[in-house]
């Protein structure tokens, strides 16, 4: 019995040794197999190299729907605008946040290089998130400097120096283009045609009346004049006496069911040129009739004519309709077309503008017309004292045609026109003008409109409350939906809000990581560019796309920095590794954007530490991007003149938490600030002495770049959804399962052998020990 127990012990020990050896072997000899299995699982879960990839839908945009990608804003509110305009420092407060859910959609997708590259077009959209701590962007308003106006002056200053004027004075001059367009629109309107009819109609009526009177025979019980007045006012058919063709459009009741009922005495008063209320009186009567037509039956002029002429409202209206639509359309129009040498009445206004023929060589400003905005002559011959030698048709085709880029009714065309003078080329063949005519036009635009009458100055300054240097707008207008009235008036198609919604970009190409995991989700081309051409030197498009996916499987060789291509400022930015971190129970690595991410760099036009100069990207708008509250910017360009900034690292830091196995960014908070510049020489180069801004503070340091005013703070962050975190944990669990799967038979079998051997050994030992003790104990007792 003892021998059997010893055999059991020996066998158990042998089995346990074998089992332990197998278990150790399973862990020591198969790590390469495990890593391959794990890597393949991660690659399958991360790499998007075909439409069938596991994460294709997430990459295409579903990820932005399922997770909360938040873009949030704080607007800077200028609390003392009037003091600032009088030379005081600015006091700012931040208003917000205004939270938006940010989503993207990738479309027109194609793969190339055997799935190593993916080409796509991306669109982005932002939707305001009501609730949380978000303010309502549609009801909250703030006051600040207007980027549209600053951009306008900044752009104009490049040319105004050559012309020897300030940017604002050049603005007044160029505003002559839309001002002239406004003149011509009025002169080409039905209202002006009616004025021309009222002015010229009496002459041609008298001619027609004399012709007709000569054909009326004298076999009447009354005089031909009385007969004409009776027929003119009440005949509903062509009279039998007189030439029938000459009666055409000479009868106010013609074709009506019943006569007008106007008395003979009233008819005599209406058509008596000596009566100051007469339709044919060119001294006072013309003003009464024009104002009555323009201002309607309730106007004072209408009522005066009714009373003085002894007719009622219906009768007066009937006379007006006949005069404008009957007589003048037939007789006066043809004469005006002939005099102006034009084929269409639509060019009558241009004829008046360059010749003054339609109003008998008089300006429209000379007529006593209620609510007429032109108090001084606006026509070129009267304003300049000389006529142009070109015809009306030539002027319309070459100078005032809205459909051509060089039209003098646009600030672009007028700018080109003035440039010919500033460069002394005097080449105006583009407009088919002689030098004399060109000098007349330049004198008109440079001197007469801006400075003599103030038309263009007043027109520009009329927009200053809503479109000037400092304006008040809702948050929604500042961010997305700004309508700048001054830009619209000038015909400038330029966005005046800081952001764009539902934008569709040019195609981009990204590495999928199929051939090189380190390139996963890095740009090859950003919007068709592999090298950016907007900067002063070569800037290659490099870095990860801003959608949160970095290179996977970096846990064993953790990168000390991550380079992201920042789409808003068009340059690569590097974040440096800081420490370990954790997001919702998942181990991550924390990275930060360094403080000096925008150093002085001539390639990027950066002249001040902490400011990214984006003026060239935004059509001359002097935009400078910084960290929040201008953190890292020297005080002489920030807190020295700006009150309300919170320049602390904790406020401005930009963190990113990377899960290094999958390469997923589980948390980040990108924070940038938009600032606007007013240069130190703005008072001498930008602002006109005729304007409102010359008292604004300007640093006395001649080397200063001016003052930079904060506009808005932009933040973008993302928090993975609970579902995504749970899915990530499940993937880790699956990866762990994949990891042990190849050795499960060996390890489990080895473990069983180990356990069985230990059990057998223990049992054998126990039995041997029991028998030995039993034997010894018996001897003792005994």
Swiss-Prot record:
The protein here is known as Lysosome membrane protein 2-C
One of the record's GO cellular component terms: vesicle membrane
Q: Does the keyword Protein transport apply?
A: no
- Any single GO BP term: phagocytosis, engulfment
Compartment annotation: Lysosome membrane
| Coiled-coil region list | none
Instruction: Give the InterPro entries listed for this entry.
Output: CD36_fam
Known post-translational modifications?
A: Heavily glycosylated.
Q: Which membrane topology term applies here?
A: Multi-pass membrane protein
* GO molecular function terms attached to this record: scavenger receptor activity
Superkingdom in the source lineage: Eukaryota
Q: Which residues lie on this side of the membrane: Lumenal?
A: 29-739
For the Cytoplasmic compartment, the record's topological domain ranges are 1-7, 761-782
- Where is the motif (Tyrosine-type lysosomal sorting signal)? 777-781
**Glycosylated residues, chain numbering:** 77, 105, 191, 219, 234, 243, 281, 368, 387, 401, 427, 432, 451, 465, 501, 536, 540, 595, 605, 613, 646, 692
Function of the molecule:
May act as a lysosomal receptor. May be involved role in macropinocytosis and fluid phase exocytosis.
